Amino acid sequence: MAKEIKFDMESRDLLKKGVDALANAVKVTLGPKGRNVILSKTYGAPHITKDGVSVAKEIELECPFENMGAQLVKEVASKTNDDAGDGTTTATILAQSIIGVGLKNVTAGANPMDLKRGIDKAVKAVVTHIAGMAKEVGDDFQKIEHVAKISANGDENIGSLIAEAMRKVKKEGVITVEEAKGTDTTVEVVEGMQFDRGYISPYFVTNTDKMEVQMENPFILIYDKKISVLKEMLPILEQTVQTGKPLLIIAEDIDSEALATLVVNRLRGSLKICAVKAPGFGDRRKAMLEDIAILTGGTVISEETGLKLENATMDMLGTAEKVTVDKDNTTIVNGAGNKEGIASRITQIKAQIENTTSDYDREKLQERLAKLAGGVAVLYVGAASEVEMKEKKDRVEDALSATRAAIEEGTVPGGGTAYIRAIAALEGLKGENEDETTGIEIVKRAIEEPLRQIVANAGKEGAVVVQKVKEGKDDFGYNARTDVFENLYTTGVIDPAKVTRVALENAASIAGMFLTTECVIADKKEDNPAAPAMPGGMGGMGGMM
């Protein structure tokens, strides 16, 4: 396919049109008075959102050169979302500002490479200043609530629910977001270890009202293969029956014949038993079975380690205070595992989380860590309609990410104030030449933009508010929700330092690449000729039988 090539100013101007198209759509969502953006969907109802990255992901422009510009800024939003989970709109605004002012200077003859060096120098100084301003969150759940509330566009209910979930599962715990059946948003905590496998047969149920198997102080048999014939496990079954305690079997699968025998004995009342399939797949299944064994003080019966089911003994079985099994999940509460063994396993999983490069693997490892360490909290998001549900779920996920970021690197005053305070770090900073110093000035101007936009979205005059915030010091800033200048820390208008840092770093990175671009190549549009008209003389064919 033929290519179209653009150089110099022409290429950069087209890219900038794309940047502006995307940034202008995204930036209206910023702040507590941010506006909604409605996204059309091919199927189903439109999606209403205030989430910057959701808006950015929808934008595709017709002109391939403009579209490249939009995709560059989309990359800023996506990367910021991946790194910090929030701050996508702020990053987009910063990128647009650095690119816009930078481009004017390049047009006026500034050296793009020197500008980039100046921009990088300024960003480094601002990041250091932000780190110095950050205040640790620690176990201050009020701060956690404030951060979550701000990120959820001022929704106090979401803020308090996330703080409650954090309080219950601690830092190691996992918090997942799911859609609720009703209209209420609630948080539920699963104590102990839960995995997503239910009973193999409903005939194991002991509580028919709830359709659950409930076991008190059961033995737990963990086997990593399929149980084909019951004869293999008869010795261990007989020993368990003699104790009078229930038995939970966790195995890869159970053959229908062996299952039928277990069910018949369960219905007769001679066996208190339940069988579930092992969680996970492949190597992850082996690791999860090992986790269960460590948590319950049992041993995984595996031929790989030389253990056979027919030779299993009672000391290979795990135990727990309580086990609940429904059709979808199995929950093991207060496993009788050795505390040191569990601590050692937790350390091992943490090391694997540090070393993994796959986001999916990291997520699964964190789930395993939570199940061993802190438990799992589920936030059920309820709403009156599907459209509202999606919008609310976006906000809950943003708030959750922001909260985690705050715990990691602390908090700074919100509402764009942290950037205004960081201007002080650039006051005496000079580059090695005039263009580098211009690069520093570009960043100094750009970091005012988030506050200007928050103010503009609230219907006020940006320049006036920015000047007044500059005149104050420390945590003094503008609360756009209440239209009041005040100490932002005391009123809970705070942002995670990590989000503030990552947004600027990613924006500057893409802007630097943009300013040093000299040539853009895209596929040439092919003009498809119109289909030829039907030849005449075909009209009489209607009469054919």
Swiss-Prot record:
Q: Which reaction does it catalyse?
A: ATP + H2O + a folded polypeptide = ADP + phosphate + an unfolded polypeptide
**Signal peptide start-end:** none
- Residues folding into a coiled coil are none
Q: Which InterPro entries match?
A: Chaperonin_Cpn60_CS, Cpn60/GroEL, Cpn60/GroEL/TCP-1, GroEL-like_apical_dom_sf, GROEL-like_equatorial_sf, TCP-1-like_intermed_sf
State which Enzyme Commission number(s) the record gives.
5.6.1.7
Return one Gene Ontology term, BP aspect.
protein refolding
Gene3D superfamilies per record? GroEL, GroEL-like equatorial domain, TCP-1-like chaperonin intermediate domain
Keywords in alphabetical order, please: ATP-binding, Chaperone, Cytoplasm, Isomerase, Nucleotide-binding
Q: What is its main location?
A: cytoplasm
Q: Name the enzyme's class.
A: isomerase
Q: Which of this chain's residues are annotated to bind ATP?
A: 29-32, 50, 86-90, 415, 495
Instruction: List the GO terms this entry assigns under cellular component, sorted alphabetically.
Output: cytoplasm
The function of this protein is:
Together with its co-chaperonin GroES, plays an essential role in assisting protein folding. The GroEL-GroES system forms a nano-cage that allows encapsulation of the non-native substrate proteins and provides a physical environment optimized to promote and accelerate protein folding.
List the PANTHER family hit by this protein, alphabetically.
Answer: 60 KDA HEAT SHOCK PROTEIN, MITOCHONDRIAL
NCBIfam families reported in the protein's UniProt record: GroEL, PRK00013.1, PRK12849.1, PRK12850.1, PRK12851.1
Name the family: Belongs to the chaperonin (HSP60) family.
Describe its assembly.
Forms a cylinder of 14 subunits composed of two heptameric rings stacked back-to-back. Interacts with the co-chaperonin GroES.
HAMAP family the UniProt entry points to? CH60
- Name listed for the protein in its UniProt record: Chaperonin GroEL
Species the sequence originates in = Porphyromonas gingivalis (strain ATCC BAA-308 / W83)
